[in-house]
Amino acid sequence: MSSNSLALKGRSDAYTQVDNFLHAYARGGDELVNGHPSYTVDQAAEQILREQASWQKAPGDSVLTLSYSFLTKPNDFFNTPWKYVSDIYSLGKFSAFSAQQQAQAKLSLQSWSDVTNIHFVDAGQGDQGDLTFGNFSSSVGGAAFAFLPDVPDALKGQSWYLINSSYSANVNPANGNYGRQTLTHEIGHTLGLSHPGDYNAGEGDPTYADATYAEDTRAYSVMSYWEEQNTGQDFKGAYSSAPLLDDIAAIQKLYGANLTTRTGDTVYGFNSNTERDFYSATSSSSKLVFSVWDAGGNDTLDFSGFSQNQKINLNEKALSDVGGLKGNVSIAAGVTVENAIGGSGSDLLIGNDVANVLKGGAGNDILYGGLGADQLWGGAGADTFVYGDIAESSAAAPDTLRDFVSGQDKIDLSGLDAFVNGGLVLQYVDAFAGKAGQAILSYDAASKAGSLAIDFSGDAHADFAINLIGQATQADIVV
Protein backbone atom coordinates (compact mmCIF):
# COMPACT_ATOMS: atom_id res chain seq x y z
CA MET A 1 0.00 0.00 0.00
CA SER A 2 1.29 3.44 -0.86
CA SER A 3 1.44 5.91 1.99
CA ASN A 4 1.96 8.90 -0.25
CA SER A 5 -0.47 11.77 0.29
CA LEU A 6 -0.98 15.02 -1.57
CA ALA A 7 -1.37 18.06 0.67
CA LEU A 8 -4.00 20.73 0.12
CA LYS A 9 -2.77 23.40 -2.30
CA GLY A 10 -5.94 25.49 -2.81
CA ARG A 11 -8.00 25.93 -5.94
CA SER A 12 -6.02 25.77 -9.17
CA ASP A 13 -5.91 28.27 -12.00
CA ALA A 14 -7.82 25.81 -14.21
CA TYR A 15 -10.63 25.51 -11.66
CA THR A 16 -10.73 29.30 -11.28
CA GLN A 17 -11.06 29.72 -15.05
CA VAL A 18 -14.01 27.33 -15.08
CA ASP A 19 -15.68 29.00 -12.12
CA ASN A 20 -15.17 32.47 -13.56
CA PHE A 21 -16.68 31.58 -16.92
CA LEU A 22 -19.62 29.78 -15.32
CA HIS A 23 -20.47 33.16 -13.79
CA ALA A 24 -19.50 35.31 -16.75
CA TYR A 25 -22.36 37.28 -18.27
CA ALA A 26 -24.45 36.54 -15.15
CA ARG A 27 -27.83 38.29 -15.06
CA GLY A 28 -30.41 39.39 -12.54
CA GLY A 29 -29.96 40.23 -8.88
CA ASP A 30 -29.94 43.56 -7.10
CA GLU A 31 -26.66 45.04 -8.33
CA LEU A 32 -26.53 47.73 -11.00
CA VAL A 33 -24.60 47.03 -14.20
CA ASN A 34 -23.41 50.11 -16.08
CA GLY A 35 -25.81 52.09 -13.92
CA HIS A 36 -28.77 49.95 -15.00
CA PRO A 37 -30.63 47.13 -13.25
CA SER A 38 -29.79 43.67 -14.58
CA TYR A 39 -32.72 41.67 -15.99
CA THR A 40 -33.04 37.92 -16.27
CA VAL A 41 -34.06 36.43 -19.63
CA ASP A 42 -37.66 36.23 -18.45
CA GLN A 43 -37.69 39.82 -17.20
CA ALA A 44 -36.18 41.04 -20.46
CA ALA A 45 -38.80 39.12 -22.47
CA GLU A 46 -41.59 40.76 -20.49
CA GLN A 47 -40.05 44.17 -21.12
CA ILE A 48 -39.84 43.54 -24.87
CA LEU A 49 -43.55 42.58 -24.78
CA ARG A 50 -44.67 45.52 -22.63
CA GLU A 51 -46.99 46.91 -25.35
CA GLN A 52 -48.98 43.65 -25.25
CA ALA A 53 -49.43 43.67 -29.02
CA SER A 54 -49.91 40.44 -30.96
CA TRP A 55 -51.74 38.71 -33.78
CA GLN A 56 -54.52 36.30 -32.89
CA LYS A 57 -54.62 32.69 -34.01
CA ALA A 58 -57.74 31.38 -35.66
CA PRO A 59 -60.05 29.60 -33.20
CA GLY A 60 -58.81 26.08 -32.57
CA ASP A 61 -55.45 26.65 -34.29
CA SER A 62 -52.19 26.00 -32.46
CA VAL A 63 -50.17 27.78 -35.16
CA LEU A 64 -50.63 31.36 -36.34
CA THR A 65 -50.65 31.66 -40.14
CA LEU A 66 -49.55 34.98 -41.64
CA SER A 67 -49.11 35.81 -45.30
CA TYR A 68 -46.47 38.19 -46.60
CA SER A 69 -45.99 40.10 -49.84
CA PHE A 70 -43.61 42.57 -51.44
CA LEU A 71 -45.13 45.85 -52.55
CA THR A 72 -44.82 46.72 -56.23
CA LYS A 73 -46.17 50.25 -55.89
CA PRO A 74 -46.83 52.77 -53.11
CA ASN A 75 -49.79 51.91 -50.91
CA ASP A 76 -52.20 54.37 -49.30
CA PHE A 77 -49.97 54.85 -46.26
CA PHE A 78 -46.93 55.65 -48.39
CA ASN A 79 -48.83 58.20 -50.44
CA THR A 80 -50.31 60.05 -47.45
CA PRO A 81 -48.42 58.94 -44.31
CA TRP A 82 -49.44 62.03 -42.30
CA LYS A 83 -53.04 60.81 -42.36
CA TYR A 84 -51.96 57.81 -40.32
CA VAL A 85 -48.88 58.84 -38.33
CA SER A 86 -48.55 62.51 -37.43
CA ASP A 87 -44.74 62.59 -37.17
CA ILE A 88 -44.03 61.18 -40.66
CA TYR A 89 -44.54 63.81 -43.34
CA SER A 90 -43.05 62.30 -46.48
CA LEU A 91 -41.39 59.01 -47.29
CA GLY A 92 -39.81 60.29 -50.48
CA LYS A 93 -39.47 57.88 -53.38
CA PHE A 94 -40.89 54.35 -53.30
CA SER A 95 -38.98 51.35 -54.61
CA ALA A 96 -39.86 47.67 -54.60
CA PHE A 97 -37.75 45.06 -52.85
CA SER A 98 -34.99 43.65 -55.05
CA ALA A 99 -34.57 39.91 -55.53
CA GLN A 100 -31.76 40.01 -52.95
CA GLN A 101 -33.93 41.80 -50.42
CA GLN A 102 -36.81 39.40 -50.98
CA ALA A 103 -34.61 36.34 -50.53
CA GLN A 104 -33.09 37.71 -47.34
CA ALA A 105 -36.48 38.77 -45.96
CA LYS A 106 -37.70 35.21 -46.42
CA LEU A 107 -34.69 33.93 -44.45
CA SER A 108 -35.44 36.39 -41.65
CA LEU A 109 -39.08 35.27 -41.60
CA GLN A 110 -37.91 31.66 -41.44
CA SER A 111 -35.68 32.44 -38.45
CA TRP A 112 -38.74 33.67 -36.53
CA SER A 113 -40.95 30.72 -37.51
CA ASP A 114 -38.17 28.33 -36.46
CA VAL A 115 -38.51 29.42 -32.84
CA THR A 116 -42.25 30.01 -32.49
CA ASN A 117 -45.61 28.75 -33.77
CA ILE A 118 -46.00 31.03 -36.78
CA HIS A 119 -46.36 29.76 -40.33
CA PHE A 120 -45.54 32.30 -43.02
CA VAL A 121 -47.17 31.98 -46.45
CA ASP A 122 -45.88 33.76 -49.55
CA ALA A 123 -48.71 35.84 -51.02
CA GLY A 124 -46.57 36.96 -53.93
CA GLN A 125 -46.23 40.53 -55.17
CA GLY A 126 -48.56 43.35 -54.15
CA ASP A 127 -50.26 44.49 -50.98
CA GLN A 128 -52.37 41.44 -50.20
CA GLY A 129 -50.11 40.01 -47.47
CA ASP A 130 -50.64 40.35 -43.75
CA LEU A 131 -47.03 41.53 -43.70
CA THR A 132 -45.75 43.84 -46.44
CA PHE A 133 -42.30 45.08 -47.37
CA GLY A 134 -41.19 48.17 -49.27
CA ASN A 135 -38.40 50.76 -49.56
CA PHE A 136 -38.52 54.53 -49.05
CA SER A 137 -35.92 57.25 -49.70
CA SER A 138 -36.60 59.97 -47.11
CA SER A 139 -34.62 59.88 -43.86
CA VAL A 140 -37.57 60.79 -41.64
CA GLY A 141 -38.10 57.24 -40.37
CA GLY A 142 -34.52 56.28 -39.58
CA ALA A 143 -32.91 53.31 -41.34
CA ALA A 144 -36.21 51.41 -41.25
CA PHE A 145 -39.49 51.32 -39.38
CA ALA A 146 -42.42 49.00 -38.82
CA PHE A 147 -45.69 48.85 -36.92
CA LEU A 148 -46.71 46.68 -34.00
CA PRO A 149 -49.88 44.58 -34.47
CA ASP A 150 -51.95 46.84 -32.18
CA VAL A 151 -52.32 49.61 -34.80
CA PRO A 152 -55.25 50.16 -37.20
CA ASP A 153 -55.53 47.67 -40.05
CA ALA A 154 -54.31 50.32 -42.51
CA LEU A 155 -50.87 50.16 -40.84
CA LYS A 156 -50.73 46.63 -39.48
CA GLY A 157 -47.92 44.39 -40.74
CA GLN A 158 -46.07 47.07 -42.71
CA SER A 159 -42.29 47.43 -42.61
CA TRP A 160 -40.27 50.00 -44.57
CA TYR A 161 -36.57 50.23 -45.38
CA LEU A 162 -34.46 53.27 -46.23
CA ILE A 163 -32.48 53.30 -49.47
CA ASN A 164 -30.99 56.51 -50.86
CA SER A 165 -27.70 57.93 -52.08
CA SER A 166 -26.35 58.36 -48.55
CA TYR A 167 -27.66 55.14 -46.97
CA SER A 168 -27.14 51.76 -48.61
CA ALA A 169 -27.09 49.21 -45.77
CA ASN A 170 -30.50 47.89 -46.86
CA VAL A 171 -29.50 47.42 -50.51
CA ASN A 172 -27.64 44.14 -50.09
CA PRO A 173 -28.71 42.41 -46.88
CA ALA A 174 -26.73 39.25 -46.17
CA ASN A 175 -25.94 36.94 -43.30
CA GLY A 176 -24.09 38.80 -40.58
CA ASN A 177 -24.49 42.32 -41.95
CA TYR A 178 -26.59 45.23 -40.74
CA GLY A 179 -29.09 44.94 -43.58
CA ARG A 180 -30.10 41.39 -42.59
CA GLN A 181 -30.19 42.37 -38.93
CA THR A 182 -32.52 45.23 -39.85
CA LEU A 183 -34.92 42.88 -41.64
CA THR A 184 -35.08 40.56 -38.65
CA HIS A 185 -35.50 43.51 -36.28
CA GLU A 186 -38.38 45.09 -38.22
CA ILE A 187 -40.16 41.77 -38.68
CA GLY A 188 -39.92 41.40 -34.91
CA HIS A 189 -41.88 44.64 -34.56
CA THR A 190 -44.61 43.46 -36.94
CA LEU A 191 -45.00 40.33 -34.80
CA GLY A 192 -45.37 42.24 -31.52
CA LEU A 193 -41.86 42.84 -30.13
CA SER A 194 -40.85 46.34 -29.05
CA HIS A 195 -37.43 47.81 -28.47
CA PRO A 196 -36.20 46.76 -25.03
CA GLY A 197 -36.35 50.43 -23.98
CA ASP A 198 -38.52 53.44 -24.75
CA TYR A 199 -36.57 54.89 -27.66
CA ASN A 200 -36.96 55.19 -31.42
CA ALA A 201 -34.80 56.37 -34.29
CA GLY A 202 -35.81 59.86 -35.31
CA GLU A 203 -37.02 60.70 -31.80
CA GLY A 204 -34.29 62.77 -30.19
CA ASP A 205 -30.80 61.31 -29.91
CA PRO A 206 -31.12 58.16 -27.78
CA THR A 207 -28.06 56.37 -26.38
CA TYR A 208 -27.38 53.34 -24.19
CA ALA A 209 -27.87 55.66 -21.23
CA ASP A 210 -31.57 55.59 -22.14
CA ALA A 211 -31.76 51.81 -21.72
CA THR A 212 -34.19 50.51 -19.11
CA TYR A 213 -31.96 47.60 -18.11
CA ALA A 214 -28.33 46.57 -18.59
CA GLU A 215 -28.84 43.71 -21.05
CA ASP A 216 -30.54 45.96 -23.61
CA THR A 217 -27.77 45.32 -26.15
CA ARG A 218 -27.32 43.39 -29.39
CA ALA A 219 -25.68 40.57 -27.45
CA TYR A 220 -29.09 39.58 -26.10
CA SER A 221 -31.71 41.02 -28.44
CA VAL A 222 -31.97 41.74 -32.15
CA MET A 223 -34.54 44.35 -31.11
CA SER A 224 -31.94 46.46 -29.30
CA TYR A 225 -30.24 49.57 -30.68
CA TRP A 226 -27.13 49.31 -28.53
CA GLU A 227 -23.76 47.72 -29.25
CA GLU A 228 -22.85 44.49 -27.50
CA GLN A 229 -19.66 46.04 -26.09
CA ASN A 230 -21.83 47.80 -23.51
CA THR A 231 -22.30 44.45 -21.75
CA GLY A 232 -18.83 43.01 -22.32
CA GLN A 233 -19.33 41.12 -25.57
CA ASP A 234 -17.61 41.82 -28.90
CA PHE A 235 -18.81 40.63 -32.32
CA LYS A 236 -16.07 42.49 -34.23
CA GLY A 237 -18.46 44.13 -36.65
CA ALA A 238 -20.82 41.19 -37.18
CA TYR A 239 -24.56 41.35 -36.50
CA SER A 240 -27.18 38.78 -35.64
CA SER A 241 -29.29 37.60 -38.55
CA ALA A 242 -31.85 35.83 -36.37
CA PRO A 243 -33.62 36.21 -33.02
CA LEU A 244 -31.31 36.11 -30.02
CA LEU A 245 -31.69 34.82 -26.47
CA ASP A 246 -34.22 37.37 -25.18
CA ASP A 247 -36.12 37.60 -28.47
CA ILE A 248 -36.70 33.86 -28.51
CA ALA A 249 -38.06 33.97 -24.96
CA ALA A 250 -40.30 36.92 -25.84
CA ILE A 251 -41.80 35.57 -29.08
CA GLN A 252 -42.44 32.20 -27.43
CA LYS A 253 -44.44 33.94 -24.70
CA LEU A 254 -46.69 35.33 -27.45
CA TYR A 255 -47.12 32.36 -29.76
CA GLY A 256 -45.55 29.37 -28.01
CA ALA A 257 -42.34 27.44 -28.67
CA ASN A 258 -41.96 25.63 -31.98
CA LEU A 259 -41.27 22.08 -30.81
CA THR A 260 -40.93 20.69 -34.34
CA THR A 261 -37.71 22.56 -35.13
CA ARG A 262 -34.54 20.47 -35.35
CA THR A 263 -35.72 17.43 -33.42
CA GLY A 264 -32.96 15.22 -34.81
CA ASP A 265 -29.22 15.20 -34.17
CA THR A 266 -28.15 18.70 -35.16
CA VAL A 267 -24.70 20.22 -35.62
CA TYR A 268 -24.14 23.96 -35.24
CA GLY A 269 -21.02 25.71 -36.50
CA PHE A 270 -18.68 23.69 -38.70
CA ASN A 271 -20.19 20.68 -40.48
CA SER A 272 -23.61 22.20 -39.79
CA ASN A 273 -26.70 20.33 -40.95
CA THR A 274 -29.10 23.10 -39.88
CA GLU A 275 -29.66 24.48 -43.40
CA ARG A 276 -29.46 27.94 -41.80
CA ASP A 277 -26.72 30.33 -42.87
CA PHE A 278 -26.39 31.99 -39.47
CA TYR A 279 -25.81 28.63 -37.73
CA SER A 280 -23.12 27.56 -40.20
CA ALA A 281 -19.36 28.21 -40.15
CA THR A 282 -17.74 27.84 -43.56
CA SER A 283 -14.15 28.94 -42.86
CA SER A 284 -11.78 29.86 -40.06
CA SER A 285 -12.71 33.51 -40.63
CA SER A 286 -16.46 32.98 -40.15
CA LYS A 287 -18.05 35.32 -37.61
CA LEU A 288 -20.85 33.48 -35.87
CA VAL A 289 -23.55 35.36 -33.96
CA PHE A 290 -26.48 33.17 -32.95
CA SER A 291 -28.68 31.74 -30.24
CA VAL A 292 -29.49 28.03 -30.48
CA TRP A 293 -33.13 26.99 -30.60
CA ASP A 294 -33.40 23.21 -30.83
CA ALA A 295 -36.34 20.98 -29.95
CA GLY A 296 -34.61 17.62 -29.49
CA GLY A 297 -32.06 15.07 -30.58
CA ASN A 298 -28.40 14.71 -29.68
CA ASP A 299 -26.86 18.02 -30.65
CA THR A 300 -23.38 19.45 -31.09
CA LEU A 301 -21.65 22.80 -31.12
CA ASP A 302 -18.76 22.23 -33.54
CA PHE A 303 -16.16 24.99 -33.46
CA SER A 304 -13.31 22.77 -34.62
CA GLY A 305 -12.27 25.04 -37.48
CA PHE A 306 -11.25 27.97 -35.29
CA SER A 307 -7.70 28.52 -34.03
CA GLN A 308 -8.43 31.13 -31.37
CA ASN A 309 -8.70 30.29 -27.68
CA GLN A 310 -12.42 29.69 -27.15
CA LYS A 311 -14.73 29.37 -24.15
CA ILE A 312 -17.74 27.14 -24.81
CA ASN A 313 -20.56 26.74 -22.28
CA LEU A 314 -23.34 24.21 -22.98
CA ASN A 315 -25.72 25.43 -20.28
CA GLU A 316 -29.04 26.93 -21.32
CA LYS A 317 -29.11 30.75 -21.31
CA ALA A 318 -25.29 30.77 -21.26
CA LEU A 319 -23.08 32.71 -23.66
CA SER A 320 -19.87 31.41 -25.27
CA ASP A 321 -16.79 33.11 -26.72
CA VAL A 322 -16.32 31.53 -30.14
CA GLY A 323 -13.98 32.09 -33.07
CA GLY A 324 -12.23 35.14 -31.63
CA LEU A 325 -15.48 36.91 -30.72
CA LYS A 326 -16.88 37.35 -27.20
CA GLY A 327 -20.34 36.29 -26.05
CA ASN A 328 -21.41 35.64 -29.63
CA VAL A 329 -23.07 32.23 -29.22
CA SER A 330 -25.85 31.53 -26.75
CA ILE A 331 -28.27 28.71 -26.00
CA ALA A 332 -31.93 29.63 -25.61
CA ALA A 333 -33.90 28.92 -22.45
CA GLY A 334 -35.19 25.35 -22.36
CA VAL A 335 -32.67 24.02 -24.90
CA THR A 336 -30.30 21.11 -24.23
CA VAL A 337 -27.17 20.79 -26.34
CA GLU A 338 -25.25 17.64 -25.50
CA ASN A 339 -21.86 17.98 -27.16
CA ALA A 340 -19.11 20.50 -27.91
CA ILE A 341 -16.00 20.38 -30.08
CA GLY A 342 -13.20 22.89 -29.63
CA GLY A 343 -10.65 24.05 -32.16
CA SER A 344 -6.86 24.17 -32.33
CA GLY A 345 -6.46 26.86 -29.66
CA SER A 346 -6.38 26.37 -25.91
CA ASP A 347 -10.09 26.09 -25.26
CA LEU A 348 -12.30 25.96 -22.19
CA LEU A 349 -15.26 23.58 -22.56
CA ILE A 350 -18.08 23.46 -20.01
CA GLY A 351 -20.77 20.80 -20.03
CA ASN A 352 -24.26 20.81 -18.54
CA ASP A 353 -26.25 18.37 -16.42
CA VAL A 354 -26.71 15.65 -19.05
CA ALA A 355 -24.17 13.15 -20.36
CA ASN A 356 -21.96 15.31 -22.56
CA VAL A 357 -19.33 14.55 -25.15
CA LEU A 358 -16.63 17.22 -25.00
CA LYS A 359 -13.67 17.26 -27.39
CA GLY A 360 -10.98 19.82 -26.81
CA GLY A 361 -9.03 19.32 -30.02
CA ALA A 362 -5.47 20.59 -30.29
CA GLY A 363 -4.13 23.03 -27.72
CA ASN A 364 -3.89 22.97 -23.94
CA ASP A 365 -7.58 22.66 -23.15
CA ILE A 366 -9.60 22.74 -19.95
CA LEU A 367 -12.65 20.45 -19.86
CA TYR A 368 -15.38 20.55 -17.23
CA GLY A 369 -18.20 18.10 -17.79
CA GLY A 370 -20.44 19.00 -14.86
CA LEU A 371 -23.09 16.46 -13.89
CA GLY A 372 -23.83 13.38 -15.98
CA ALA A 373 -21.62 10.53 -17.18
CA ASP A 374 -19.53 12.53 -19.62
CA GLN A 375 -17.17 11.37 -22.36
CA LEU A 376 -14.18 13.71 -22.46
CA TRP A 377 -11.44 13.94 -25.08
CA GLY A 378 -8.65 16.37 -24.38
CA GLY A 379 -7.04 15.94 -27.79
CA ALA A 380 -3.47 16.92 -28.58
CA GLY A 381 -1.77 19.14 -26.01
CA ALA A 382 -1.60 19.27 -22.22
CA ASP A 383 -5.22 19.09 -21.11
CA THR A 384 -6.84 19.50 -17.70
CA PHE A 385 -10.04 17.76 -16.61
CA VAL A 386 -11.66 19.80 -13.85
CA TYR A 387 -14.11 18.70 -11.14
CA GLY A 388 -15.92 20.92 -8.64
CA ASP A 389 -18.20 18.41 -6.90
CA ILE A 390 -18.04 14.68 -6.20
CA ALA A 391 -21.47 14.27 -7.85
CA GLU A 392 -19.94 15.29 -11.18
CA SER A 393 -18.40 11.83 -11.60
CA SER A 394 -20.05 9.45 -9.19
CA ALA A 395 -19.23 5.78 -8.88
CA ALA A 396 -22.66 5.00 -10.34
CA ALA A 397 -22.22 7.31 -13.35
CA PRO A 398 -18.52 7.99 -13.84
CA ASP A 399 -16.98 10.18 -16.51
CA THR A 400 -14.61 8.62 -19.01
CA LEU A 401 -11.44 10.41 -20.07
CA ARG A 402 -10.96 8.95 -23.52
CA ASP A 403 -7.36 9.88 -24.33
CA PHE A 404 -5.50 10.54 -21.08
CA VAL A 405 -1.72 10.97 -21.38
CA SER A 406 0.22 10.66 -18.14
CA GLY A 407 2.80 13.37 -17.55
CA GLN A 408 0.94 15.68 -19.90
CA ASP A 409 -2.72 15.75 -18.87
CA LYS A 410 -4.09 16.50 -15.40
CA ILE A 411 -7.13 15.51 -13.36
CA ASP A 412 -7.93 18.60 -11.29
CA LEU A 413 -9.78 17.97 -8.02
CA SER A 414 -8.68 21.21 -6.36
CA GLY A 415 -12.21 22.61 -6.42
CA LEU A 416 -13.75 19.80 -4.39
CA ASP A 417 -15.06 21.14 -1.10
CA ALA A 418 -13.60 18.24 0.89
CA PHE A 419 -10.12 19.45 0.00
CA VAL A 420 -10.75 23.20 0.01
CA ASN A 421 -12.80 23.57 3.19
CA GLY A 422 -12.79 20.12 4.76
CA GLY A 423 -9.05 19.76 5.15
CA LEU A 424 -9.14 16.28 3.64
CA VAL A 425 -5.83 14.82 2.46
CA LEU A 426 -5.74 12.37 -0.42
CA GLN A 427 -4.01 9.08 0.37
CA TYR A 428 -3.35 6.44 -2.27
CA VAL A 429 -3.98 2.85 -1.25
CA ASP A 430 -4.38 -0.57 -2.82
CA ALA A 431 -7.75 -1.19 -1.15
CA PHE A 432 -10.21 0.92 0.82
CA ALA A 433 -10.00 0.52 4.59
CA GLY A 434 -12.81 2.78 5.75
CA LYS A 435 -10.90 6.05 5.93
CA ALA A 436 -12.09 9.19 4.19
CA GLY A 437 -9.68 10.45 1.56
CA GLN A 438 -8.39 7.09 0.43
CA ALA A 439 -7.88 6.77 -3.33
CA ILE A 440 -7.18 3.88 -5.67
CA LEU A 441 -5.46 4.30 -9.01
CA SER A 442 -5.71 1.24 -11.25
CA TYR A 443 -4.56 0.35 -14.74
CA ASP A 444 -4.91 -2.68 -16.99
CA ALA A 445 -2.09 -2.81 -19.53
CA ALA A 446 -3.92 -5.26 -21.78
CA SER A 447 -6.96 -3.05 -22.29
CA LYS A 448 -5.08 0.22 -21.68
CA ALA A 449 -7.90 1.21 -19.35
CA GLY A 450 -7.42 2.85 -16.00
CA SER A 451 -9.49 4.38 -13.23
CA LEU A 452 -9.41 6.67 -10.23
CA ALA A 453 -11.71 5.92 -7.29
CA ILE A 454 -11.95 7.95 -4.08
CA ASP A 455 -13.77 7.23 -0.82
CA PHE A 456 -14.85 10.61 0.58
CA SER A 457 -17.28 9.31 3.22
CA GLY A 458 -15.03 6.75 4.87
CA ASP A 459 -17.36 3.80 4.29
CA ALA A 460 -14.83 1.78 2.26
CA HIS A 461 -16.75 2.45 -0.96
CA ALA A 462 -16.00 4.84 -3.79
CA ASP A 463 -18.07 8.03 -3.80
CA PHE A 464 -16.20 9.46 -6.76
CA ALA A 465 -14.80 7.62 -9.77
CA ILE A 466 -13.31 8.36 -13.17
CA ASN A 467 -12.63 5.86 -15.94
CA LEU A 468 -9.69 6.47 -18.23
CA ILE A 469 -8.40 5.26 -21.54
CA GLY A 470 -4.78 5.63 -20.55
CA GLN A 471 -2.92 5.48 -17.27
CA ALA A 472 -2.85 8.17 -14.60
CA THR A 473 -0.26 8.43 -11.84
CA GLN A 474 -0.35 10.26 -8.54
CA ALA A 475 1.56 13.15 -10.11
CA ASP A 476 -1.28 13.64 -12.61
CA ILE A 477 -3.85 14.34 -9.89
CA VAL A 478 -4.16 17.95 -8.74
CA VAL A 479 -5.69 18.70 -5.34
UniProtKB/Swiss-Prot annotation:
Gene3D superfamilies: Collagenase (Catalytic Domain), Serralysin-like metalloprotease, C-terminal. It catalyses: Preferential cleavage of bonds with hydrophobic residues in P1'. Keywords: Calcium, Hydrolase, Metal-binding, Metalloprotease, Protease, Repeat, Secreted, Zinc, Zymogen. Ca(2+) 7 binds at residues 379, 381, 383, 409. GO terms for biological process: negative regulation of complement activation, classical pathway; negative regulation of complement activation, lectin pathway; positive regulation of sodium ion transport; proteolysis; symbiont-mediated evasion of recognition by host pattern recognition receptor. Ca(2+) 6 binds at residues 370, 372, 374, 392, 399. InterPro entries: Hemolysin-typ_Ca-bd_CS, Hemolysn_Ca-bd, MetalloPept_cat_dom_sf, Pept_M10B, Peptidase_M10B_C, Peptidase_Metallo, Serralysin-like, Serralysin-like_metalloprot_C. Transmembrane segments: none annotated. SUPFAM superfamilies: beta-Roll, Metalloproteases ('zincins'), catalytic domain. Changing residue 460 to R: In strain: IFO 3455. Ca(2+) 8 binds at residues 455, 457, 459, 461, 463. Its main location: secreted. Changing residue 127 to H: In strain: IFO 3455. Pfam families: HemolysinCabind, Peptidase_M10_C, Reprolysin_4. Ca(2+) 3 binds at residues 343, 345, 347, 360, 362, 365. Binds 8 Ca(2+) ions per subunit. The active site is at residue 186. This is Serralysin. It comes from Pseudomonas aeruginosa (strain ATCC 15692 / DSM 22644 / CIP 104116 / JCM 14847 / LMG 12228 / 1C / PRS 101 / PAO1).
